Amino acid sequence: MRPNNRELNQVRPVKITRHYTRYAEGSVLVEFGETKVLCNATVEETVPRFLKGQQQGWVTAEYGMLPRSTHSRMQREAAKGKQGGRTMEIQRLIARSLRAVVDLKALGERTVTVDCDVIQADGGTRTAAITGACVALHDAMSKLVADGVLKENPMKGLVAAISVGIVDGNAVCDLEYVEDSNAETDMNVVMVEDGRLVEVQGTAEGEPFSHMELLQLLDLAHQGINQLLDAQRKALGL
């Protein structure tokens, strides 16, 4: 039996709270069960040097975990003087996922940075971050339209992500920490509204997984992400 008696294909309760902080152009607290991530989107009237004069914008992301977001305190990466490989991998994943649903030409020469800070971690922090960051980004873009800076929202749609895996021989959706730490196979899937995939990260922690198991996991992810997309649309009133 899964934690909280969930079915194999059942996602955790999802809550998306918009306008969570005061200053950011887009601010969302996203909750996947006990995993909670704060996503703040900031708009700046500048672009990276490699995009100067290209008449297009940029979307990027940063990711971090608060020291006591886990069972025992972690040292802040700032105190260590460098970011870890996991952090850099995750924030690049978030940024790639967001850029997949933005018309960068329509954004103009602006940069939107989405800061994703994990307040509490219980598995699936990167997938929750992507799902919440998309809503924060949508709000930031909508503000540019409302303020008369842009004529149309550059968002081409929504993107969401979920974890799937094989635990005790069963394919399961939206893994909690206790499942993730014991999974034979762990996979993160990022998908846009029409079902196309942005990224699939899959690893066999023990026994290799079969082609049929891969297809089963992707089907589970598709079902779960559709529920997340529904939650995003409901939060945004779309």
UniProtKB/Swiss-Prot annotation:
The organism of origin for this protein: Actinobacillus pleuropneumoniae serotype 7 (strain AP76)
UniProt keywords, alphabetically: Nucleotidyltransferase, RNA-binding, rRNA processing, Transferase, tRNA processing, tRNA-binding
Entry EC no(s): 2.7.7.56
Recorded superkingdom: Bacteria
SUPFAM superfamilies, alphabetized: Ribonuclease PH domain 2-like, Ribosomal protein S5 domain 2-like
Protein purpose: Phosphorolytic 3'-5' exoribonuclease that plays an important role in tRNA 3'-end maturation. Removes nucleotide residues following the 3'-CCA terminus of tRNAs; can also add nucleotides to the ends of RNA molecules by using nucleoside diphosphates as substrates, but this may not be physiologically important. Probably plays a role in initiation of 16S rRNA degradation (leading to ribosome degradation) during starvation.
Coiled-coil regions, chain positions: none
Principal EC category: transferase
The name this protein goes by in its record: Ribonuclease PH
Record-stated family: Belongs to the RNase PH family.
Gene giving rise to this polypeptide: rph
Gene Ontology MF terms in the entry: 3'-5'-RNA exonuclease activity; tRNA binding; tRNA nucleotidyltransferase activity
Reaction equations catalysed: tRNA(n+1) + phosphate = tRNA(n) + a ribonucleoside 5'-diphosphate
InterPro entries attached to this UniProt entry: ExoRNase_PH_dom1 (IPR001247), ExoRNase_PH_dom2 (IPR015847), ExoRNase_PH_dom2_sf (IPR036345), PNPase/RNase_PH_dom_sf (IPR027408), Ribosomal_Su5_D2-typ_SF (IPR020568), RNase_PH (IPR050080), RNase_PH_bac-type (IPR002381), RNase_PH_CS (IPR018336)
